[in-house]
From Swiss-Prot:
Lineage, uppermost ranks: Eukaryota, Metazoa, Chordata, Craniata, Vertebrata
Protein name as annotated: Inositol-tetrakisphosphate 1-kinase
Co-factor remark: Binds 2 magnesium ions per subunit.
EC number assigned by the record: 2.7.1.134, 2.7.1.159
Binding site for Mg(2+) 2: 295, 297
Family from the record: Belongs to the ITPK1 family.
The organism of origin for this protein: Gallus gallus (Chicken)
GO MF annotation: an example: inositol-3,4,5,6-tetrakisphosphate 1-kinase activity
């Protein structure tokens, strides 16, 4: 790898907070030792003058959201970034902007999860029913909720899946609680999961599963409980100690996540969106043992992932050698967006024709302590050694395009 990477140039744009949190300078130093030049990009200046660039790593989520609010400076930055991408299709972007936009919208990402679950037809996976509320709750809201397969209690989240406010959530137990809901938002069925959340941190074909505390169990059906408002970031911190996470007793089944299921979900999302750096929040239904994806995050914090920098550099090497499946989809993604009349720019779904594992064998489970709320469960490589059915692409594109055209 070292010989191949020598002389390559990797540009990155991250907020100063993200750089400090990740200690990204350590990654830059690791790259330099491998002969890779790392360039911190200044988007206020022409990117052309800062090139050439073989790969660009970014987290432009804040800038994209501000641009969507018509902030003139952010609009200019996003436009400059997009113009460089258009002028340099040979540059690998981690990750493509259309995919980031999908992950920034919980309604769209949940719909994608639903379509993937429908395609996979794996009984070990369930997609929690959800719906988007775009206006204040009225007399017909309860009917709509029932029509969409939701039942009390359910969890209410902001539609935007990024930023401080995105962690502010509520558990609604009855019709009275609907009065406090502030649209636009997304409501999602609450699934009892014995107060355990599994955060899956994905880097290309590698992933790490970290165990975190989560919400305790609640009785199914309508109750007279008052709505519970909470910050999910605080609840699921490694060191979190909250009455909301204090489990009276383990109910139903208590299972660890199935490695095969995690691998298949991660692979499906990579293929559907063409993304490399993302996080998946998974809970295990304590009645059925099914895995439920309750959130997806673009370029998460990777807390507890000790090998993040090594995985990232390995992935960069793989994409530059054309061995990472998601990267081969970028040009096809653009074509699909054009073919669907532009509306698919935020709903792109494309599949690989196959992928090659270059990372080696899967490593074993590592459980440091059953009482530790932040336990690293595993560090795995996604070994994809079989072709993916072309119908996967057709299924996702057709269903999402149909939904998009109906809105």
């Amino acid at each position: 790898m070292q010989t191949f990477l020598k002389g390559k140039r990797v540009g990155y744009w991250l907020s100063e907070k993200k750089i400090r949190k990740l200690n990204f300078q350590a990654f830059a130093e690791l790259c330099r030792k491998r002969g890779v030049e790392v360039v911190q990009l200044d988007l206020t200046k022409p990117i052309e003058d800062q090139g050439p660039l073989d790969v660009i790593i970014h987290k432009l989520t804040d800038v994209i959201l501000e641009a969507d609010q018509n902030d003139s400076q952010s609009l200019e930055l996003v436009q400059r970034f997009q113009e460089y991408i258009d002028a340099h299709p040979e540059t690998i972007i981690l990750d493509p902007l259309p995919a980031i936009r999908t992950l920034l919208d919980r309604s769209k990402s949940y719909e994608l999860i639903r379509q993937i679950e429908a395609y996979m037809q794996d009984e070990r996976i369930c997609s929690p029913p959800f719906m988007e509320l775009t206006s204040a709750c009225g007399e017909d809201t309860l009917q709509l909720i029932e029509k969409n397969g939701l039942a009390f209690p359910f969890i209410c989240k902001t539609r935007v899946a990024h930023g401080t406010n995105s962690h502010e959530m509520a558990i609604i137990f009855n019709q009275e609680g609907l009065k406090a809901v502030r649209p636009p938002c997304v409501i999602q069925s609450f699934i009892n999961h014995n107060a355990v959340l599994y955060k899956v941190f994905v880097v290309g074909e590698s992933y790490t599963v970290v165990k975190r505390p989560s919400l305790k169990n609640f009785s199914a059906g309508i109750s007279d409980r008052e709505s519970i408002f909470f910050n999910s970031h605080n609840v699921s911190k490694p060191e979190s100690s909250s009455v909301l996470t204090a489990l009276d007793k383990i109910e139903g089944v208590f299972e660890r996540p199935d490695d095969d299921v995690i691998r298949e979900i991660s692979k499906a999302l990579r293929q559907a969106l063409g993304v490399s750096l993302f996080g998946i929040d998974i809970i295990i239904n304590n009645q059925t043992g099914q895995h439920a994806v309750i959130d997806i995050n673009a370029f998460p914090g990777y807390e507890g992932v000790s090998e993040f920098f090594t995985d990232l550099l390995n992935h960069i090497a793989a994409v530059l050698q054309g061995q990472a499946p998601e990267v081969t989809q970028l040009n096809r993604s653009k074509l699909l967006a054009e073919q669907t009349g532009g509306i698919m720019d935020e709903r792109i779904c494309c599949a690989s024709t196959g992928c090659i594992s270059v990372m080696g064998k899967d490593s074993s489970w590592i459980v440091e302590s059953e009482t530790n709320s932040s336990v690293k469960l595993q560090h795995q490589r996604l070994g994809c050694n079989s072709a993916v059915s072309p119908s996967f692409q057709q299924h996702c594109v057709a269903t999402l395009a149909t939904k998009a055209s109906s809105q």
